Amino acid sequence: YYVHVVEFGVYECKAKGVFRKEKIKPLVGDNVEIEILDESEKKGNIVKILPRQNELIRPAVANIDQALVVFAITKPNPHFNLLDRFLVMMESKEIPVVLCFNKEDIATNPQVKELEAIYESCGYPLVFVSAKEERGIETIRELLKGKTTAIAGPSGVGKSSIINILQPEAD
């Protein structure tokens, strides 16, 4: 596990055996206490996982402020049942959701209007983007600013493309 310690950097840490015995696994986003084993090599052990504000199983994360749920408008067409399951899961954990629909550059106006009619009326913030043309990315950047955000969605919808535009060093 890589643990970011404010003002000291990133430490490569192992979880103590006590976590395995208690069937607790550290998650991305966990706030933890570590013991430093080797300062020069930035090695340590996770000794305590602090209480979680929230946690998700898929993606396996904890302590998030919001979720950016990404689906394509087309190619692949949105699977509404899957999208609704994402929304129900986030609602059950009281995690605010921003819905991001990618591939606006190849979508038709009726496709966009259908998504607006369904999900805007439910009160979800919607962002329509084209990762290919880097359109709408600044809106996402503003919505993410200062928040710990989980990004979720099915394969092939452009999650990695959006992340790579937002943070090229993440590639």
Predicted ranges, named:
Residues 1-80:
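N-terminal accessory targeting/assembly segments
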Residues 29, 90, 144:
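Residue-level signature of catalytic and energy-coupling elements of molecular machines
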Residues 79-82, 111-112:
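Residues at alpha-helix caps and immediate loop-helix transition turns in enzyme cores, especially N-
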Residues 81-91:
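Histidine-anchored nucleotide/phosphate-binding helix
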Residues 105-157:
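Canonical P-loop GTPase G-domain recognition
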